[in-house]
Amino acid sequence: MATFPPLPMTHTRLAILARQKLPCSSKKIPRAQLIKEKEDIDYYLEQNFKGLSKEEVAAHRNSYKKSICVDMLRDGFHKSFTELFALMEQWDKLPEAAKAQSLFWQQRPLEDQPDKLDNFYHYLTRAEAAERKGYYEEVYNNLYALACYFDNSEDKWVRNHFYERCFNIAQLIKADGGKKEAEAESHMGLLFEEEGELLKAAEHYEAFHELTHGRLWKDGTGQLLNLVACESLVRTYRLLSDRMLENKDYKQAIKILIKASEIAREGNDRSMEGEASYYLGLAHLASGEYETALTVLNRYSEISTSLDDDHGLGRAYEAIAKALQSQGETTEAINYLEKFVTIARNNLQSLDMIRACTMLGDIYNEKGQYSKASEYFQQAFSTAMELMKTALMDETKVHYGIARAHQMMLAMKGYIESADSNGLNCLLSWKETRTQIEYDPILGESRRATEDNIYQLPDAEEETRRSPENQ
């Protein structure tokens, strides 16, 4: 069979270059030739595909993250590139650090989040341009905008980085009288507070408070910066005092809470002043200074009353009752706890209700008034049942059971002391059935009672029977 000669094929320059680089080619191409061929391809694309520039080709060839870095360098923002590159390196190390701690890392890589890269480019380059001109307030504003953009649980470390940058730049701003410096101190205080370094947080909040003292500066929400400083400082002092109280360092805890109370009064905020008084009163109570605790807690009670703050008033009554009980003044303590129960019931504060009823039950149980104790423990148990909290149900159930047992104890004691067959039969009958004991008038009302009668036994009679003289 006759064969036809092969048809002549014409190839473009681009196709020729591409075919020469196919992996099936056995020809080894030197590096210099590869670079030249790349330049030839770029030139060919630029000449034959109008509207597709060399930069556009690079944009399609490179990742978006690399393109952002290239743009920064091409536009002359070398400091911005250095800062962004360092943040990128740290970002890439986060999954490895999480894996070392056996944590599941869910955050996407930075190259998959173009919006964040755009914000980096926009604000970092603007900040660098302003810094070159000496416009430090504009530098601060751009860096703070980045801190606000990254203020979320995933990127908090990025936010903290820009908080530190803002703090350093704020030291150079003198035209605003120190307002930016005060804001930067506030942000650094928050940074350390969230990390649990309360002493460093207190230092920054103290500087924030000092810079805003006597100033009418306001934040973005219209709140006075001095009030924000007072609130931040009082909160940090309280957290520090909690640690001191855990370590039984009552003197230092009281000392720092007194400072918190003074700052709260300076802020002219009655609610904050009341909170400071409450925690100071608790510190005095923990240290055994009951009279001082009562004085401070009564002030908190007065403030809560003036503010119509039922929750605060209930807390005040609870703490005052504890102080009175520690002094042995149980009657006064009962009065305050009954007020606490009323407030908790009216405001549907179930946990407060359980706590108040349990405290009342304990007091009546110690006094030997078992009917009252059983009544309050039953209220606590019923409230815990409504909440369906297993731990609370178990605890209140035990208290209620003990109070019921104490009620029955007097009836059992009466039957045992009767020392006759009727009393013995009643005891045996109860042991077999564990039901309510039927009252037998033959045994006499003076020394014996059924379980029903014991539940309604006057508290005075119970206390008399329990007294050492009667025993």
Curated annotation (Swiss-Prot):
Disruption phenotype: Knockout mice generated by CRISPR-Cas9-mediated gene editing display minor morphologic and ultrastructural defects of sperm flagella, which result in profound alterations in sperm flagellar velocity and beating frequency that strongly impair fertilization. One of its GO terms (cellular component) is cytoskeleton. It comes from the Eukaryota. GO terms for biological process: cilium movement. TPR repeats lie at residues 92-131, 136-173, 182-215, 234-267, 274-307, 314-347, 354-387. This is Tetratricopeptide repeat protein 29. Gene3D superfamilies: Tetratricopeptide repeat domain. Keywords: Cell projection, Cilium, Cytoplasm, Cytoskeleton, Flagellum, Repeat, TPR repeat. Residues 449-471 are annotated as: Disordered. InterPro entries: Bac_ResReg_Asp_Phosphatase (IPR051476), TPR-like_helical_dom_sf (IPR011990), TPR_rpt (IPR019734). The gene is Ttc29. Expressed in spermatozoa (at protein level). SUPFAM superfamilies: TPR-like. The TPR repeats are required for axonemal localization and flagellar beating. Axonemal protein which is implicated in axonemal and/or peri-axonemal structure assembly and regulates flagellum assembly and beating and therefore sperm motility. It comes from Mus musculus (Mouse). It is found in: Cytoplasm, Cytoskeleton, Flagellum axoneme.
